[in-house]
């Protein structure tokens, strides 16, 4: 493991202590709306025992929402930060989720395993090469009739939150992260055959829906 990756892990381990507060400030009243939007977009109501993988799951808010909504789901949260996973494991319903420590660019699963693979507000923080590898890995592990759901930020409108957003991106985001966000769905169209884009009602986040 490189010194850079170890350093990033230490950063996220430390950030895990204030992560939920940061999201609360950024999302304000739209936090639950954003999660519901992602979970509803999975359209798993008619699927028996669906399998869902949440990449870069952080403190587990999204994958725990899947576990709450679908009683028979096999829900797996995947993150390379032990600190984030500890926070996730301490939350309500965590006993219904399997949390795994690992690298998004090298998933420890076989091909065509999951009905849904999702990644919420984290892909832009990966380095360009790792980001591309992670997308190919998501494509590999999702079922042929499954979906990859990528939720990303729209640039915040409020001046203070916008400033904090760019400061965090400057500190830990790779050099191409702003460019990646500006490109919209183009990076996804280079990997997946079918890509569509939708937005939350609040306009704070966008959802990229990808199929093999």
Predicted feature residues:
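A short glycine-rich, Lys/Arg-flanked "PGG" loop and its adjoining helix->strand segment in the class I
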Residues: 132-144
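A short SAM/SAH-binding and catalytic strip from SAM-dependent methyltransferases
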Residues: 116-129
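C-terminal alpha-helical "lid/dimerization" subdomain adjacent to the S-adenosyl-L-methionine
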Residues: 3-6, 62, 149-204
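Class I SAM-dependent methyltransferase SAM/SAH-binding core
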Residues: 53-55, 59-106
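A short acidic, Gly/Pro-enriched loop at the edge of an enzyme's catalytic core
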Residues: 105-117
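C-terminal lobe and adjacent flexible extensions of AdoMet/dcAdoMet transferase-like proteins
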Residues: 208-212
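Conserved class I S-adenosyl-L-methionine
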Residues: 1-44, 65, 165-166
């Amino acid at each position: 493991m490189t010194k850079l990756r170890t350093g990033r892990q230490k950063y996220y381990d430390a950030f895990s202590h204030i992560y939920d507060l940061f999201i609360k400030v950024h999302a304000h009243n739209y936090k639950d709306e954003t999660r519901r939007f992602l979970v509803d977009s999975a359209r798993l109501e008619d699927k028996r025992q669906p399998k869902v993988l949440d990449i870069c799951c952080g403190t587990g808010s999204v994958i725990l929402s899947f576990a709450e909504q679908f009683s028979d789901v096999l829900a797996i949260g995947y993150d390379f930060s032990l600190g984030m996973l500890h926070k996730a494991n301490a939350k309500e319903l965590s006993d219904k989720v399997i949390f795994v420590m690992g690298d998004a660019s090298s998933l420890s699963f076989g091909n065509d395993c999951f009905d849904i693979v999702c990644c919420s507000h984290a892909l832009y923080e990966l380095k360009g090469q790792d980001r591309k590898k992670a997308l190919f890995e998501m494509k590999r592990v999702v079922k042929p009739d499954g979906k990859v759901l990528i939720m990303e930020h729209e640039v915040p409108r409020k001046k203070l939150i916008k400033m904090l957003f760019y400061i965090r991106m400057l500190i830990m985001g790779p050099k191409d992260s702003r460019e990646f966000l500006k490109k919209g769905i183009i990076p996804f169209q280079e990997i997946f055959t079918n890509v569509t884009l939708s937005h939350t009602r609040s306009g704070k986040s966008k959802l990229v829906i990808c199929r093999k």
